[in-house]
Amino acid sequence: MTKILYGNEVALKIKEDLNLRIDKLKEKNIIPKLAILRMGNKPDDIAYERSIIKSCEKLNIETKVEELSEDILEEDFLKLMESLNNEKEIHGILVFRPYPKHLNENTINSSIALNKDVDCMHPLNLERIFEGDLNGFMPCTPEAVIEILKYYDIDLKGKNIVIINRSMVVGKPLSMMLLSHNATVTICHSKTIDLPSITKKADIVVTAIGKAKLIKEEYFNEDSIVMDVSINVDENGKLCGDVDFENVKEKVGAITPVPKGVGSVTTTLLLKHIVDAAERNS
């Protein structure tokens, strides 16, 4: 029988610990605070912003939102970032991606203070992960994948894991993190030939391609553990992942649902990183 790997159970456990830690910070008159930088008014960004603010409010984490024009000059953005880096009450900084095309992504990411880089966007923080050091901030989504697997006692050592994503946001950092846990990792992408033949041999498949219900049962074997990272909208306007959940759910060993899967843990880990930063800087 297929096991459903609910992320909201993992998130709840993390939040219970965060409540205790936030109370201790409050005794020192420290309130964890996140700065959110959003360029433009894309509906997806606004929805994500609201969900983060709502999650922060539930844990008494403060937020400061900087609503910026998509046409903002790079020098003006960097001045704002310098100000936020120097603001002692700000413990974490999150910049929504993708950036407007006229901004240099590396320059923007490099402008975030290392100790406030709660989603691991700075090249030096990413470099640390590629060197096998998982002691600092990690990208929230890849970390969420690993936290769910750990929560359900799925040992990564020696596992053959296929990641369908090669971005610096998910695929590449996740591959390095999994290697640090002694997994054997294969990265696939849009140019991969005969993808199902590769995924079907894997113990664990992580998909993050952003295509609603594209992945069907022929991609898996009966023991496959399926981690669906994507949050898409189907033809009926309902949230779904890359995997056709109803088609697959009885034909694999375990699977994360969408919603209530990886996404719920991703947001919770962002909150954890804010609290981590507040504690380190207290």
Swiss-Prot record:
Subunit relationships: Homodimer.
Function of the molecule: Catalyzes the oxidation of 5,10-methylenetetrahydrofolate to 5,10-methenyltetrahydrofolate and then the hydrolysis of 5,10-methenyltetrahydrofolate to 10-formyltetrahydrofolate.
Coiled-coil blocks: none
Recorded catalytic activity of this chain's protein: (6R)-5,10-methylene-5,6,7,8-tetrahydrofolate + NADP(+) = (6R)-5,10-methenyltetrahydrofolate + NADPH; (6R)-5,10-methenyltetrahydrofolate + H2O = (6R)-10-formyltetrahydrofolate + H(+)
GO biological process annotation, one example: purine nucleotide biosynthetic process
Annotated NADP(+) binding sites: N165, R166, S167, S190, I231
InterPro entries: Aminoacid_DH-like_N_sf, NAD(P)-bd_dom_sf, THF_DH/CycHdrlase, THF_DH/CycHdrlase_cat_dom, THF_DH/CycHdrlase_NAD-bd_dom
EC number from the UniProt entry: 1.5.1.5, 3.5.4.9
Protein name per the record: Bifunctional protein FolD
Biochemical pathway: One-carbon metabolism; tetrahydrofolate interconversion
Protein's organism: Clostridium botulinum (strain Langeland / NCTC 10281 / Type F)
Keyword NADP attached: yes
SUPFAM superfamilies the UniProt entry points to: Aminoacid dehydrogenase-like, N-terminal domain (SSF53223), NAD(P)-binding Rossmann-fold domains (SSF51735)
Top-level taxon in the UniProt lineage: Bacteria
A GO CC term assigned to this protein in UniProt: cytosol
Keyword tags: Amino-acid biosynthesis, Histidine biosynthesis, Hydrolase, Methionine biosynthesis, Multifunctional enzyme, NADP, One-carbon metabolism, Oxidoreductase, Purine biosynthesis
Alphabetized GO MF terms: methenyltetrahydrofolate cyclohydrolase activity; methylenetetrahydrofolate dehydrogenase (NADP+) activity
